[in-house]
């Protein structure tokens, strides 16, 4: 059983944390070795950048993937002998045949190879070598996914063979490339630029063996940290694609509050705007930018009510690709601004024949004018963040090889960042490697089936293999045939408790119900949401830990147990932070109300929270769970901070419950900040909590290295 419950008063103390150096795309000269048309940069003992340019036009600008190359120079040696260049670190040996192109057809004696030791086995890599053991990453969307669609996943940064390669010149799945950033020296947004030598090779070899956490940590050193979302993001989101009126949404909020259901985000889907093309209020075009006053007669008043009286945050859904129609409220202002900015471009590049201003977000003038005239008015009345939905081309129309998804994420996220008011984030799909810098991910329109639910724990944890730690799924499923399934919805919500974002959602079909109080098992669903809010102190601390380490909150078992075969086989379970193992029920109990599940518990003791049993690990156990029970386990010695019952996260409680799990000595560094401050890197505090068999101690930490 849990050994102790301790109430700890939360001190309102914010102590500055130490901030590391700013990103610098220029590597230290001491890390660079040139040989003819080749350039090598030794970034860490396990990571080497490899470039080839027949024009000797090497890139020092930031790319879509890599924004920082100025790392401490590791120890390495370089030597030329017998016609080869050798670079040797503590972990790798690179051999390059002088004067040759690095890619060759001779697999026995390649022009370039890197050798490393993986648990006593010598592994040899050469350009073009395939890896069937890559542990995968993620994909752009789960739109129309039903069940296991792992074949959609891109390769990740981790592999059981011990190495992986970031190839900056390899096309992404959407057909785009990793392009370059042109630095804005005036403090504005860095903008897309083409490479100097489009035929150059540019790749990063990562030979970390099975030290997966170090691989991800070093990746985020060169590719940027995983930003920490605002605290309220980790609460419950209510969402439904439905032609709601303002009064409908007020009624839903009041129903939620009257039934003591915690909530922090109300999502307003696309019917908030009128038909952009016709100006009509009785039907909706995908693209639109002006409020439908027939449905929302007082948008500013409504959002003020959400913020001030209901303690909620909100977002609006966008489908931007059709541009800005002439009947939009601020069309004239946008047209006049762009006409002046586009003065050196033919008039027909600004609009279509019907006068619609073309969508051209890859143009910086368009970005600045569009945000000023179209989006800023909505932000000024309180829209907190943007949900950028689909309906644009995969590749930008006016910039070669530019992926629209990645670029929209970059622009929307950094626009919020430049405002410097609150913590920036964007709600959109995955745009490819480097997209971890722009959370949060909207996984799209999956099917409402148990098989789709069963895939999501694996999918979400595996995304951490590319640093993408914040997928938000349509809890309950998006597309649904047939009647509502109370068991499926409950199990999906229970999984959502232990996923990065808890957001219920579905498409506009009238028969699909996402209001949990409409179900007979409402109290079980609400109890799951209560559990989510109780765990917020732990979740938020783990989110900060992800920012600091590059390791996602939801992560596969093999990060912690890389040499255990079970860690790779039991894909439906995962670590939720450092101390909680979760194995959600993702199949129907066929009316028995009890589900059996095989769970691999690693070495040590594990506290099964739902039953109160302390179980010996090191084996696979078969456990039974009623519908209200969620299979999750505390590691022995774990200290889990919990909030008391609460309805929202805008005002946090003054007390904290600490649950101590018996067994080994435990420690937890409890994290706090203002919740939505843009300067969380510096304005924060950590409290170290430790336990042994005799005592519990609390220590405020004065600084934290980031």
What are these regions (language model features)?
Residues 9-16:
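Bacterial N-terminal signal peptides
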Residues 45-82:
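A low-complexity, Ser/Thr/Gly/Pro-enriched, surface-exposed linker/loop concept
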Residues 79-230, 240, 253-258, 624-644:
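Catalytic and substrate-binding clefts that recognize carbohydrates or anionic sugar/phosphate headgroups
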Residues 146, 240-262, 266-269, 273, ...:
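A conserved hydrophobic secondary-structure block that centers on an alpha-helix together
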Residues 262-525, 560-562, 570:
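Aromatic- and carboxylate-enriched substrate-binding clefts and catalytic-loop regions
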Residues 435, 440, 465-466, 470-473, ...:
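Catalytic core of carbohydrate-active enzymes
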Residues 699-706:
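Conserved small/polar residues in nucleotide/adenosyl-binding loops
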């Amino acid at each position: 059983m849990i050994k102790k419950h301790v109430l700890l008063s939360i001190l309102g103390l914010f102590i500055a944390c130490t901030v590391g150096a700013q990103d610098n795309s220029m590597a230290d000269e001491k890390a660079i070795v040139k040989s003819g048309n080749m350039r090598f940069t030794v970034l860490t003992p396990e990571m080497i950048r490899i470039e080839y340019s027949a024009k000797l036009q090497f890139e020092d600008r930031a790319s879509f993937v890599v924004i920082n190359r100025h790392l401490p120079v590791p120890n390495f040696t370089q030597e030329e002998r017998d016609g080869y260049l050798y670079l040797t670190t503590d972990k790798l040996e690179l051999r390059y045949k002088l004067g040759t192109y690095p890619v060759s057809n001779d697999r026995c004696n390649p022009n370039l190879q890197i050798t490393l030791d993986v648990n006593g086995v010598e592994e040899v890599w050469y350009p073009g070598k395939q890896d069937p053991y890559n542990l995968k990453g993620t994909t752009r969307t789960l739109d129309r996914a039903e069940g296991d669609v792992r074949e959609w996943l891109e390769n990740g940064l981790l592999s059981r063979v011990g190495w992986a390669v970031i190839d900056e010149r390899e096309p992404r799945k959407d057909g785009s490339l990793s392009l370059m950033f042109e630095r804005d020296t005036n403090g504005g947004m860095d903008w897309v630029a083409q490479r100097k030598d489009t035929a150059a090779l540019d790749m990063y070899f990562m030979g970390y063996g099975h030290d997966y956490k170090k691989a991800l940590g070093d990746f985020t050193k060169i590719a940027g940290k995983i930003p920490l979302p605002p605290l309220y993001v980790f609460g419950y989101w209510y969402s439904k694609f439905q032609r709601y009126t303002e009064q409908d949404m007020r009624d839903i909020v009041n129903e939620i509050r009257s039934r003591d259901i915690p909530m922090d985000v109300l999502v307003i889907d696309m019917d908030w705007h009128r038909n952009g093309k016709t100006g009509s209020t009785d039907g909706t075009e995908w693209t639109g930018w002006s409020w439908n006053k027939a449905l929302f007669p007082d948008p500013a008043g409504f959002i003020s009510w959400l913020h001030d009286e209901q303690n909620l945050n909100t977002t609006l859904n966008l489908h931007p690709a059709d541009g800005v129609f002439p009947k939009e409220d601020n069309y004239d202002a946008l047209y006049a601004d762009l006409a002046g900015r586009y003065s050196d471009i033919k008039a027909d590049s600004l609009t279509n024949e019907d006068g619609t201003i073309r969508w051209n977000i890859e143009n910086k003038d368009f970005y600045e004018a569009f945000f000023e005239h179209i989006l800023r008015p909505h932000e000024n009345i309180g829209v907190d963040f943007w949900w950028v939905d689909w309906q644009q081309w995969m590749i930008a129309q006016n910039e070669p090889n530019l992926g629209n998804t990645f670029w929209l994420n970059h622009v929307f996220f950094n626009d919020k960042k430049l405002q410097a008011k609150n913590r920036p984030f964007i709600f959109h799909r995955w745009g490819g490697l480097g997209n971890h810098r722009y959370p949060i991910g909207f996984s799209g329109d999956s099917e409402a089936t148990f098989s789709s639910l069963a895939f999501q724990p694996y999918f979400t944890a595996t995304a951490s293999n590319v640093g993408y730690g914040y997928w938000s799924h349509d809890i309950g499923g998006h597309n649904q045939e047939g009647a509502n399934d109370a068991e499926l919805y409950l199990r999906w919500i229970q999984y959502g408790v232990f996923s990065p974002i808890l957001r219920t959602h579905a498409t506009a079909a009238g028969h699909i119900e996402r209001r949990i109080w409409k179900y007979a098992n409402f109290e079980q669903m609400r109890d799951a949401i209560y559990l989510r809010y109780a765990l917020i102190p732990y979740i938020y601390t783990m989110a900060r830990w992800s920012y600091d380490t590059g390791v996602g909150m939801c992560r596969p078992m093999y990060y912690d147990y890389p040499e255990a075969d079970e860690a790779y086989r039991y894909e439906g379970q995962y670590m939720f932070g450092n101390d909680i193992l979760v194995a959600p029920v993702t199949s129907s109990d066929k009316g028995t109300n009890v589900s059996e599940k095989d769970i691999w518990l690693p070495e040590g003791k594990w506290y099964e929270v739902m039953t109160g049993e302390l179980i010996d690990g090191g084996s696979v156990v078969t456990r039974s769970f009623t519908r209200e029970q969620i299979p999750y386990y505390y590691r022995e010695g774990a200290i889990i901070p919990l909030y008391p019952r609460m309805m929202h996260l805008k005002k946090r409680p003054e007390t904290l419950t600490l649950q101590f799990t018996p067994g080994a000595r435990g420690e937890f560094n409890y994290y706090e900040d203002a919740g939505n401050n843009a300067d969380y890197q510096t304005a924060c505090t950590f409290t170290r909590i430790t336990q042994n068999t005799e005592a519990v101690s609390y220590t405020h930490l004065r600084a934290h290295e980031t």
